[in-house]
Curated annotation (Swiss-Prot):
Highly expressed in pancreatic islets. Expressed in lung, small interstince, colon, kideny and brain. Disruption phenotype: Mutans are viable into the adulthod. They exhibit smaller pancreatic islets, defective beta-cell proliferation and decreased blood insulin levels after treatment with a high-fat diet. Beta-cells show increased expression of proteins characteristic of the endoplasmic reticulum stress response. This is Sphingosine-1-phosphate phosphatase 2. It comes from Mus musculus. Residues 91-99 are annotated as: Phosphatase sequence motif I. Has specific phosphohydrolase activity towards sphingoid base 1-phosphates. Has high phosphohydrolase activity against dihydrosphingosine-1-phosphate and sphingosine-1-phosphate (S1P) in vitro. Sphingosine-1-phosphate phosphatase activity is needed for efficient recycling of sphingosine into the sphingolipid synthesis pathway. May play a role in attenuating intracellular sphingosine 1-phosphate (S1P) signaling. May play a role in pro-inflammatory signaling. Plays a role in the regulation of pancreatic islet beta-cell endoplasmic reticulum stress and proliferation. Residues 161-172 are annotated as: Phosphatase sequence motif III. Its EC number is 3.1.3.-. Belongs to the type 2 lipid phosphate phosphatase family. It is a multi-pass membrane protein.
Length: 354
């Protein structure tokens, strides 16, 4: 078993996969970082890698909430936040390095400073795809085999993209998938509780804010700075904001037509041009408001924190300090989550888009 685990952590295994897919290191004299000999795999896995990054989740999850099913989006967000927090913390506790360069070709630079085990891209992709499958199979009428195939293909492409980009070993990916499978199995009995969070007691908002903030503020200390803590705070804060937004809607009765709780069997309506235009309009309106709120709250929170701690405003290194980074990220993305679930639907209603 130990020999098998060592072989799965071997960087040469990742390098061989890259070579099979047409990705090679460039010669030093060429001035290039890598050579691509198969652009089909290059674009396939670069696109697949994007499916596990922030740009996908800040588009897919809001789109699901505004156009498909708010209850489904809440469940997806809660599970996503849970697996991502555990995965990010596990990275900084285990401190396993990423595949070595050389022989591996690295296509991503931003997260090189992070540790590798487990792959949070693999965890997020597996969590989103299979939570979506499990949550919809008793709510919408569609061929289960088709849904299962789509979930497997989605998560597999994201996992393979982490090998292609040189960011993870095979063991990192298998570990991420296994951890996610265990978390889904353990939390599944409590999924109905997630659906009733909006009817919790008036003290619920305090817990939703205080507990996630403390989890982020007491994040494991790394040997050197990496974006892991900031990314984790962003994810956890967004989840707290979404959960709080649902509670606000219920407590203040801001939802004019309550959505039925899961599960309710429904037919998937056919996609028409009018539905597509309406959905894209709601999405664009919502995203613009979210970006506006994000920009305003981030700027205001940074100004307050810089003033409080007497820090030079344009000092980029100051943003990385624990007492500044966590509060400003948390306030910003909690506001984004509340905006997405409360103010955007109100704007949609005002504009006649509901």
């Amino acid at each position: 078993m130990a020999e098998l685990l060592r072989s799965l952590r071997d960087s040469q295994l990742v390098a061989r996969f890259q070579r099979r897919c047409g990705l090679f290191p460039a010669r030093e004299a060429s001035g290039e970082e890598h050579v691509v000999k198969n652009y089909f795999y290059y674009y396939l896995f670069r696109f697949s890698a994007a499916l596990g990054q922030e740009v996908f989740y800040i588009t897919f999850l809001p789109f699901t909430h505004w156009n498909i099913d708010p209850n489904l989006s809440r469940r997806l967000v809660v599970i996503w936040v849970l697996v991502m927090y555990i995965g990010q913390v596990a990275k900084d506790i285990l401190k396993w390095p990423r595949p070595s360069f050389p022989p591996v070709v690295r296509l991503e630079k931003r997260i090189i400073a992070e540790y590798g085990m487990p792959s949070t891209h693999a965890m997020a992709a597996t969590a989103i795809s299979f939570t979506l499958l499990i949550s919809t199979m008793d709510r919408y009428q569609y061929p289960f085999i088709l849904g299962l195939m789509m979930a497997v293909v989605f998560s597999t492409l994201v996992c393979l993209s982490r090998l292609y980009t040189g960011m993870h070993t095979v063991l990192d990916i298998l570990g991420g998938v296994l951890i996610t499978a265990v978390l889904i199995a353990l939390t599944y009995p409590a999924w109905t509780l997630i659906d009733s969070l909006d009817s919790a007691s008036p003290l619920f908002p305090v817990c939703v804010i205080v507990v996630p903030f403390l989890l982020c503020y007491n994040y494991p200390v790394s040997d050197y700075y990496s974006p892991t803590r900031a990314d984790t705070t962003t994810i956890v804060a967004a989840g707290a904001g979404v959960t709080l937004g649902f509670w606000i809607n219920h407590f203040f009765q801001l939802v004019s037509k309550p959505t039925p709780s899961l599960p309710v069997i429904q037919n998937i309506p056919p996609l028409t041009t009018d539905m597509l235009v309406l959905g894209l309009t709601k999405f664009m309106v919502g995203i613009m408001l979210i970006l506006l709120v994000r920009q305003l709250v981030q700027k205001l929170s940074l100004q307050v924190l810089f003033s409080w701690f007497k820090v030079v405003t344009r000092n980029k290194e100051a943003r990385r300090r624990l007492e500044i980074e966590v509060p400003y990220k948390f306030v910003t993305y909690t506001s984004v989550g509340i905006c997405a679930t409360t103010f955007v639907p109100m704007l949609h209603r005002f504009l006649g888009l509901l």
